């Protein structure tokens, strides 16, 4: 009588973790293979990295000297209240907007920099 796949699976299922570890090592030695996961190289490699980013985050790095003006611009951009906008400006670096287009991110950056802030687009 031949051993079936089901018999093997049932036998393996009843083993402890230590016994399974020993079994894997025995397979590696007997057949000269490794149970390590193989890293598959992406076929799109450099092309994927060259793909242009479509969503950007606008980060307020610092408010600079014109804090009041920066708070006003943050309020206008985000629609937040005075306290919330002040907390963002005081807590810099903080993300002002997430997932915006490149044009919108550059527009926000321009407004904030004109108010005296330092801004990063990520």
Swiss-Prot record:
Q: Cite a GO CC annotation.
A: cytosolic large ribosomal subunit
Q: Which organism is it from?
A: Neisseria lactamica
Stated family: Belongs to the bacterial ribosomal protein bL12 family.
Designated gene of the protein? rplL
What is any Pfam family matched here?
A: Ribosomal_L12
Q: What is this protein called?
A: Large ribosomal subunit protein bL12
NCBIfam families given in the database record: L12 (TIGR00855)
Free-text function comment from the UniProt entry: Forms part of the ribosomal stalk which helps the ribosome interact with GTP-bound translation factors. Is thus essential for accurate translation.
Q: Where is the signal peptide?
A: none
Q: How does it assemble?
A: Homodimer. Part of the ribosomal stalk of the 50S ribosomal subunit. Forms a multimeric L10(L12)X complex, where L10 forms an elongated spine to which 2 to 4 L12 dimers bind in a sequential fashion. Binds GTP-bound translation factors.
Per its UniProt record, what InterPro entries does this chain match?
Ribosomal_bL12, Ribosomal_bL12_C, Ribosomal_bL12_C/ClpS-like, Ribosomal_bL12_oligo, Ribosomal_bL12_oligo_N_sf
Any GO MF annotation of the entry: mRNA binding
Q: State the superkingdom.
A: Bacteria
Q: Which UniProt keywords apply?
A: Ribonucleoprotein, Ribosomal protein
In its UniProt record, which GO terms are filed under biological process? translation
């Amino acid at each position: 009588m031949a051993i079936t796949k089901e018999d093997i699976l049932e036998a393996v299922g009843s083993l402890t973790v230590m016994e399974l570890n020993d079994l894997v090592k025995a397979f590696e030695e007997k057949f000269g293979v490794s149970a390590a996961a193989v890293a598959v190289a992406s076929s799109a490699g450099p092309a994927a990295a060259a793909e242009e980013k479509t969503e950007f985050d606008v980060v307020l790095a610092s408010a600079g000297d014109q804090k009041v003006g920066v708070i006003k611009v943050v309020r206008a951009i985000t629609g937040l209240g005075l306290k919330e906008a002040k907390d963002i400006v005081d807590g810099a670096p903080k993300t002002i907007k997430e997932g915006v287009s490149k044009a919108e991110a550059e527009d926000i950056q321009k407004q904030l920099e004109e108010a005296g802030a330092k801004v990063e687009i990520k």
